[in-house]
């Protein structure tokens, strides 16, 4: 048995759990609430992550717990603020496999009032006219409809009879009763934008047509749907969270777990992109369809539901979310954020090591904290056409940096006070502010732009240059502050046999014992490698999906960890760590680019002739200009196979350089330096770079797989070029792609491309104006 959902009854001090068993049946369970905290105690038998002894207080009564917690007010407490439901899940379900959920995919249609128009979700004056539910445990789509008022019962019955599992109703109440009967054995309700429309409309409509008490039938455990406000298009909207039976909006799941952004998130656009299917097309309005073509209206409602089912069957995002929730003992809706899930993952890891974690810090308003942390390094590309561009990228850059420098709150030794950096930032903010249009005196610019051009705190640069005349302050974690020259700090870290490392943020970490977070990331990384290997071995068998899902879970956890740690609402938030990650990451990427340029052109610089572009964890380069003379003279027989071999060896050389660089730049031991790994990702024969985040490459080899076989000319990777914008008419999208193929794949001349553009312009001018702006035309 494993949990589906759980609630905490504060009055009864109980945790009520809905479970789904291996037998496919629903079960109910309950546990006494366990209220726990730890406090510093020299005689304590347990340890915090910082290594200090602590003692435990626990109670089954909330009032007793809160009374005791007040006694320790103002003192450092541990885990007193852990969610009591998550604690129960951790104590009772850790390492229990996720259950196979019963999911109902659904979609509703609503009537239109000719006088009052469409009804909003908070005032649902129009009746629901159709509900389609696909129940995955029965593999059936069931549709409930109410006929238009003008239609005779006989005609309506004839139309409905043409569809399987479709039921005609004369009253909304009967239809809602049937809907509740159908979802009785569902664990999850999901729809497309159901958070914004279907759920709030249905809950409010049931309240109006039946009663508020009837809305309990959406939930289990006798609970009412819980109202929640959220922001949408800059406006506050209200929706409802279901209890016992969970609601998950598939649109939100898609946005979270599909890593490529889409110009349109409408079901029609996503259906076409993911499964090659569209919504049912019709002329006029949905109200006209309902009243004039009832058959197509039913078809439309059923197709909306089945399109969602097909998208899910391909992507399996619900199963992914379920797996994430259970691996980290949180509730299913919790995975829609990353902070609470990552916190529980770290807490569970600490407990496995016999340690406890501190309470969240109370937020203190501080100008220094308000200064935005440095972001990723993104270079300005060399604009124009480039031939034979290769890309090398670093595997999981940020998680790897955290592991390599053993970054954790409990491993921080000291921080070099950022007096120079703060002054530089202040001066730059004022200078950029003064340059703004209509600038007022004292205007400042804030944000990541202030870090442009920097690869570390100024203090870090002074230390690495061993400047004797630059006096800096080292703030130790034990409260001491010591003034030293930058050269003395370098000697203290790099030349005194201490197990210390210095990040590019000027934070000193110890590698004496592994931190909880780096250890957890190391485990996830090795588990991912292992499950990737098993997935590869199981390809073509029933077990492939099982292993592939598990490696994807690890990938998501690794990527989520850094974002959560940099979120000020996270228990483990520390700006020093967040900035150490990005600035050290910048140093590593800068080195990789410099190393690649040295291998190709003989000069150690990240802005050398071989470098085309750099972004976050990737370097785009070309060796072709350096070899042009040799190719021209016939000394080198240039072809794709030779290019692949050469670029692979360039990537290997960059990869092999990391351990020595990590020791020189951060004083990282060799085994830590070996954590940073890069690999050749792609090679393209032709590419065009426009500006940051906007480029296109015709790829002929991606990670060792050829893309130009069996008549294919390659695979175009287009970033930020608006080729698939939802508001771009189809014929314009096709034209833009055709031009890109002419330039990158077919080798057309400049004159031919210009003529193609002129021809398109002539056709466009001659077209009727109403067709020009239609995305469907």
Mark where each language-model region is.
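Active-site palm subdomain of RNA-directed nucleic acid polymerases
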Residues: 279, 589-616, 628
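Short active-site loop/helix that positions an aromatic residue
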Residues: 198-208, 395-409
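Common nucleic-acid-contacting/processivity interface regions adjacent to the catalytic cores
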Residues: 287-406, 414-416, 421-434, 543-595, ...
């Amino acid at each position: 048995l494993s949990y589906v959902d759980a609630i905490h009854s504060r009055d009864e001090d109980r945790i009520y759990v809905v479970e789904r068993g291996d037998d496919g049946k629903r079960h109910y369970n309950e546990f006494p609430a366990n209220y726990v905290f730890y406090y510093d105690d020299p005689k304590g038998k347990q340890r915090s992550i910082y290594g200090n002894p602590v003692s435990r207080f626990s109670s089954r009564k909330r009032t007793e717990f809160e009374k005791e917690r007040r006694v320790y007010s103002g003192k450092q407490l541990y885990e007193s603020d852990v969610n009591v439901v998550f604690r129960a899940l951790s104590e009772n379900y850790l390492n229990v496999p996720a259950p196979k959920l019963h999911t109902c995919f659904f979609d509703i249609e609503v009537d239109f009032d000719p006088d009052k128009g469409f009804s909003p979700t908070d005032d649902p004056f129009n009746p629901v006219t159709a509900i389609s539910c696909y129940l995955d445990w029965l593999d059936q789509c069931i549709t409930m409809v109410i006929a238009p008022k003008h239609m005779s019962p006989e005609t309506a019955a004839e139309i409905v009879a043409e569809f399987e599992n479709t039921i005609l109703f004369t009253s909304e109440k009967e239809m809602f009763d049937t809907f509740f009967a159908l979802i009785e054995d569902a664990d999850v309700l999901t729809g497309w934008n159901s958070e914004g429309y279907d759920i709030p409309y249905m809950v409010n409509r049931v309240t109006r047509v039946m009663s508020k008490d009837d809305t309990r039938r959406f939930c289990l455990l006798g609970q009412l749907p819980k109202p929640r406000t959220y922001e949408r298009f800059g406006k506050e909207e209200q929706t409802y969270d279901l209890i016992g039976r969970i609601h998950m909006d598939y649109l939100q799941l898609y946005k979270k777990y599909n890593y490529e952004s889409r110009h349109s998130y409408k079901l029609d656009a996503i259906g076409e992109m993911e499964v090659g299917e569209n919504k049912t097309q019709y002329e006029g309005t949905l109200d006209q369809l309902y009243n004039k073509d009832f058959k197509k209206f039913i078809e439309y409602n059923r197709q909306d539901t089945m399109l969602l089912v097909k998208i899910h069957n391909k992507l399996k995002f619900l199963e992914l979310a379920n797996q994430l929730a259970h691996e980290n003992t949180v509730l299913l809706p919790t995975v829609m954020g990353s902070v609470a899930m990552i916190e529980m993952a770290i807490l569970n890891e600490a407990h496995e090591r016999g340690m406890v974690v501190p309470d969240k810090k109370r937020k203190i308003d501080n100008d220094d904290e308000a200064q935005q942390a440095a972001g990723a390094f993104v270079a300005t590309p060399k604009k124009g056409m480039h031939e034979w561009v290769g890309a090398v990228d670093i595997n999981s850059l940020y998680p790897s940096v955290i592991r390599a420098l053993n970054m954790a709150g409990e491993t921080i030794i000291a921080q070099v006070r950022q007096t120079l950096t703060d002054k530089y930032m202040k001066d730059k903010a004022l200078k950029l502010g003064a340059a703004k249009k209509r600038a007022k005196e004292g205007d400042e610019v804030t944000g990541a732009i202030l870090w442009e051009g920097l690869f570390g705190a100024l203090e870090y640069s002074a230390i690495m240059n061993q400047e004797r005349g630059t006096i800096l302050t080292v703030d130790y974690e034990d409260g001491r502050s010591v003034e030293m020259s930058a050269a003395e700090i370098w000697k203290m870290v790099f030349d005194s046999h201490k197990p210390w490392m210095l990040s590019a943020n000027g934070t000193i970490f110890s590698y004496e014992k592994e931190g909880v977070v780096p250890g957890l990331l190391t485990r996830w990384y090795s588990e991912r490698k292992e499950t990737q290997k098993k997935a590869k071995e199981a390809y073509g068998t029933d077990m492939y999906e099982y292993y592939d899902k598990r490696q994807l879970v690890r990938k998501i956890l690794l990527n989520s960890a850094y974002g959560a740690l940099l979120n000020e609402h996270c228990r483990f938030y520390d700006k020093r760590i967040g900035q150490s990650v990005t600035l050290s990451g910048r140093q590593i990427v800068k080195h990789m680019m410099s190393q690649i340029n040295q291998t190709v052109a003989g000069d150690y610089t990240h802005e050398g002739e071989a470098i085309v572009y750099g972004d976050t964890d990737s370097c785009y380069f070309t060796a072709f200009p350096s070899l042009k003379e040799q190719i021209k003279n016939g000394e080198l027989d240039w072809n794709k196979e030779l290019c692949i071999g050469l670029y692979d060896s360039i990537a290997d050389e960059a990869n092999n350089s990391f351990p020595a660089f990590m020791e020189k730049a951060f004083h990282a031991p060799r085994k830590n330096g070996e954590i940073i790994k890069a690999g050749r990702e792609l090679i393209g024969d032709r590419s065009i770079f426009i500006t940051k985040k906007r480029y296109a490459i015709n790829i002929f080899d991606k990670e060792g797989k050829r893309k130009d076989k069996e008549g294919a000319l390659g695979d175009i990777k287009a970033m930020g070029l608006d080729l698939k914008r939802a508001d771009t008419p189809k014929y314009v999208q096709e034209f833009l792609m055709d031009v890109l193929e002419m330039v990158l794949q077919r080798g057309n001349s400049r004159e031919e491309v210009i003529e193609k553009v002129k021809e398109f312009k002539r056709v466009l001018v001659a077209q009727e104006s109403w067709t020009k702006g239609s995305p469907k035309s």
